[in-house]
A protein has these predicted regions:
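Short, glycine-/small- and polar/acidic-enriched structural segments
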Residues: 1-151, 157-172
Length: 172
C-alpha cells in the first residue's frame, strides 16, 4: 500500500526521506546526487528513474516584462519569437546595479534544474548569476542578480509582493 503525503517544500521532502519519515519520494533530479556527495546534507540516496521532461519556464514581473519590451521591440508583438533570451534584461540588471540594488529572482532549490536553467539563461546574456565556491554554497559570489530559494506554491504571491521580480519553475 502506498500513501501519498504532500510536503511543503523540497528541503522538507529531502529531510523526511533521509530521516525515514518517507520511504521514497518524487524529488528534484539533483537532490539524490547532491545528498550523496554531501552538498548541504550528507546521505546516500539512490534514484530509480528520472521523470524530467524539461518543462520549466521563466516568468518575470509585468513591470520587468514592460521594460524588456522597451529594450527589444520584437518582444512587443502578439507572439514574440521564442525562445526569449535575457538580452533585453541585461540593461535592467545594470540599472539596478547602478542604483546599488540587485534584481531578485526565485528558483525552487539550489540543486534543481530550475536553478541551473535560470543561471544559464542569465549568463547567456552576459548577466553574471553568481558562482559556487567552497565557502559559498548559495552561489552568490560575484553575482549581478540575487537568486533565492522560493517554494513553488509561494512564487506568484512572492512576485506580486515585489520580493522577487522573476522566477523559474516547472509543473510537477
Amino acid at each position: 500500500q502506498v500513501e501519498v503525503v504532500a510536503q511543503p517544500n523540497w528541503k522538507t521532502l529531502l529531510d523526511n526521506v533521509i530521516n525515514g519519515d518517507l520511504d521514497g519520494a518524487h524529488m528534484l533530479s539533483g537532490q539524490p546526487i547532491a545528498a550523496t556527495i554531501g552538498f548541504g546534507t550528507k546521505a546516500h540516496i539512490i534514484t530509480a528513474f528520472t521523470m524530467d521532461l524539461n518543462g520549466n519556464g521563466i516568468t518575470v514581473a509585468n513591470s520587468i516584462w514592460d521594460q524588456m519590451k522597451e529594450n527589444d521591440p520584437e518582444l512587443d508583438k502578439d507572439k514574440p519569437k521564442h525562445p526569449i533570451t535575457a538580452d533585453s534584461l541585461k540593461p535592467i540588471v545594470q540599472e539596478k546595479l547602478d542604483e546599488g540594488e540587485k534584481l531578485q529572482m526565485g528558483m525552487v532549490f539550489p540543486v534543481s534544474t530550475h536553478n541551473y536553467e535560470l543561471r544559464y539563461w542569465l549568463a547567456s546574456a552576459g548577466i553574471h548569476p553568481g558562482m559556487y565556491t567552497k565557502t559559498d554554497i548559495g552561489g552568490r559570489t560575484d553575482a549581478e542578480v540575487e537568486l533565492s530559494v522560493t517554494p513553488p506554491p509561494m512564487m506568484p504571491a512572492t512576485l506580486e509582493a515585489g520580493n522577487i521580480q522573476g522566477y523559474c519553475v516547472g509543473e510537477p
